[in-house]
Design a protein with these regions (language model features):
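N-terminal subdomain of nucleotide-sugar transferases
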Residues: 1-52, 56-63, 89
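Conserved donor-binding/catalytic core segment of Leloir-type glycosyltransferases
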Residues: 4, 158, 204-221, 227-230, ...
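Donor nucleotide-sugar binding/catalytic pocket of nucleotide-sugar-dependent glycosyltransferases
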Residues: 39, 143-195, 204-206
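Glycosyltransferase donor-sugar binding loop
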Residues: 41-44, 184, 214, 241-257, ...
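Active-site donor-binding acidic/aromatic loop of nucleotide-activated sugar
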Residues: 251-254, 266-276, 283
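Aromatic "clamp/platform" in nucleotide-sugar-dependent glycosyltransferases that forms part
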Residues: 295
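Conserved acidic donor-binding segment of nucleotide-sugar-dependent glycosyltransferases
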Residues: 327-328, 332-340, 349-354
Length: 396
């Protein structure tokens, strides 16, 4: 079976989904499928992978086609449109990632027109929070006239959690659904490097108790809660330092820094910017506690990575992974409402109880290694693809 994955960007600066696709493609290639990925040359706002534009690059068992983007918004790519029109019929299945993007919508439309079944993974873009808080009017119009027809003719919908499925179906998704949790490279996270790389790069963290937030800097991540939560926590734990690891839109990040200044936190927050590779792993090794106070997450890859690293984790009900973890086992995560007081109380409890931290970290690491692996994700998608291939094709 030959499968094409389509996503607007593979830049890790965009967070979990963009970082996940290479793992997914590799797992499917290892499972015996022929896999290609088509994307733009986007490397975050104002940047592009200049050396990769308009070419096919061989990766570990699969190929990636990079096409030049013409716009930041919507990631319009006319070279992609020309290519997908001529090549979509080369594939048995098209797996579309994310919606409200030119590449994803074009791929679905051309696949439908040529009778190639397509599967959609919305990756949270149909969640209620995003529909209401991100370009609400534009999204409502686009959804009605562009995305809704695409959803209607999808062979199936893939959701990362039951919570994501509920919200997408409330938004109007009606295609057959499959819930497949995302997988991560637990082998790397089980054997972390030492904290020295991080501590040498950010020496102000030495001798401190590290509270780690490691994710994209975005309004949905609850950073407006995290800052006052840390201000409250610091009163009882003066050695605590908050590490905010991630990148985001300049205006939004500047607003966060101003908020931190007004709270008197300037000397106790380390703004690292985007961390990847050994820097990211070393940050996980240096951390005492991981926190993700998001309002909305269709899964929560950053949380899963912290669990796999053996960190005690504090999160909120808006992170869909939390619901799935709690349904599988108790005493793995601390999950409290997305409000300052309960978050501050829970964070203080974690920092003050070493035994609790050790227990939660060990349980989290065990669950991640046993139930959220790349191989299990690949096997589940291979099975789903086979089921779609055996289903009657819809007529354009």
């Amino acid at each position: 079976m030959k499968v094409l994955h389509v996503i607007p960007s593979l830049s890790p600066k965009h967070g979990g989904t963009s970082s996940l696709i290479p793992l997914m493609a590799g797992s499917l290639a290892n499972a015996g499928l022929k896999v290609d990925v088509a994307t733009t040359d986007d490397d975050g706002p104002g940047h592009r992978f200049e050396d990769l534009t308009n070419q096919r690059v061989e990766r570990d068992g699969y190929g990636v086609y990079y096409f030049r983007k013409q716009t930041e918004f919507y990631k319009i790519s006319l070279p992609f449109r020309k290519w997908i029109a001529g090549h979509v019929s080369d594939y048995d299945l098209v797996h579309v990632h994310v919606m409200f993007s030119y590449t994803s919508n074009s791929a679905a439309r051309f696949a439908r027109g040529l009778g190639v079944p397509y599967l959609i993974s919305p990756h949270g873009v149909l969640n209620g929070w995003g529909m209401k808080n991100r370009r609400r009017l534009i999204k409502a119009l686009s959804f009605q006239f562009v995305e809704k027809p695409i959803l209607r003719y999808a062979a199936a919908m893939h959701y990362t959690s039951r919570a994501e499925q509920r919200e997408a179906e409330q938004a109007g998704a009606t295609a057959p659904a499959a819930v497949i949790p995302l997988g991560i490279d637990t082998t790397v996270l089980k054997n972390l490097p030492g904290p020295e790389t991080f501590l040498n790069r950010f020496p102000q963290a030495k001798g401190r108790t590290l509270i780690l937030f490691l994710s994209r800097l975005d309004a949905k991540k609850g950073l407006d809660l995290l800052l006052p939560v840390f201000a409250e926590t610091r009163r009882k734990h003066p050695l605590a330092v908050l590490v905010i690891a991630g990148s985001g839109e300049e205006g939004y990040v500047a607003g966060l820094r101003d908020h931190a200044d007004r709270l008197g936190l300037t000397g106790d927050i380390i703004w690292t910017g985007f961390l990847g590779g050994v820097d990211k792993l070393s940050a996980l090794a240096a951390a005492t506690v991981f926190i993700l106070p998001s309002y909305s997450e269709n899964f929560g890859i950053a949380l899963m990575e912290a669990m796999a690293a053996g960190l005690p984790c504090l999160t909120t009900p808006g992170v869909a992974l939390a619901e799935d973890v709690q349904a599988r086992a108790a005493d793995v995560l601390m999950v409290v409402p997305a409000e300052v007081k309960p978050l501050a109380a829970a964070l203080g409890q974690l920092l003050g109880d070493a035994a609790l931290r050790a227990r939660l970290g060990a349980n989290a690491k065990r669950m991640a290694a046993g139930q959220f692996t790349i191989s299990s994700m690949g096997a589940a998608f291979k099975k789903l693809y086979a089921e779609i291939a055996q289903s009657p094709k819809q007529h354009p």
